[in-house]
């Protein structure tokens, strides 16, 4: 199975609620990836400004009960990886998400669970763990929850609530993020 495009959107219905999810290609938004064309040949070929315009237009038209944006790289998270990655995401993608009051931004990349809330934003920034390799994590400013456990997350919704459950490899719910309207 292949993805429909490098970035795309789909609407789901769950329990009478509608959820719009945008999957975005974050590597081209990060200078490090665009500038290292031999290591990351695809990132430098992409027009990230065109993608940001598309994201803005899709979010402008979004009428669903809940909106989630999913990408590979974190906007806010604790990680030993290069700080410039998050700085680029904060400068490029985050202002659009805040403008449109997105409910959640979900990412991976750093292989642990994190739930971060930052001052001035109502977005829940979620880092999902990995099914195998997991990495150590420590709280940063805005951390609501963090865990190095391997696992996965499940999202469910109703008209009044959006819920994301972080589940470890044994099936235990480690943390629940609940948004209400």
For each of these PLM feature ranges, what is it?
Residues 62-79:
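Short acidic, glycine-rich surface-loop motifs adjacent to enzyme active sites
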Residues 171-173:
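Residue-level signal for glycine
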Residues 158, 167-168:
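C-terminal domain-closing interface element
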């Amino acid at each position: 199975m292949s993805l429909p495009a490098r970035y795309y959107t789909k609407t789901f219905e769950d329990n009478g609620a509608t959820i719009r999810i945008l999957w975005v290609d974050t590597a081209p938004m990060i200078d490090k990836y665009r500038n290292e064309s031999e290591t990351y040949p695809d990132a430098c070929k992409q027009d990230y400004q065109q993608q940001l315009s598309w994201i803005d237009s899709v979010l402008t038209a979004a009428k669903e009960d809940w909106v989630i944006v999913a990408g590979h790289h974190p906007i806010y998270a604790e990680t030993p990886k290069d700080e410039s990655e998050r700085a680029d995401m904060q400068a490029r993608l985050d202002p659009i998400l805040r403008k449109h009051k997105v409910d959640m931004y979900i990412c991976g990349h750093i292989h642990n669970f994190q739930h971060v809330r930052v001052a001035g934003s109502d977005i829940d920034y979620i880092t999902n763990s990995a099914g195998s390799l997991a990495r150590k994590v420590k709280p940063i400013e805005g951390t609501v929850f963090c865990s190095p456990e391997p696992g996965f997350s499940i999202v469910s919704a109703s008209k009044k609530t959006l819920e994301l459950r972080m589940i470890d490899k044994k099936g235990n719910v480690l943390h629940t993020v609940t948004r209400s309207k």
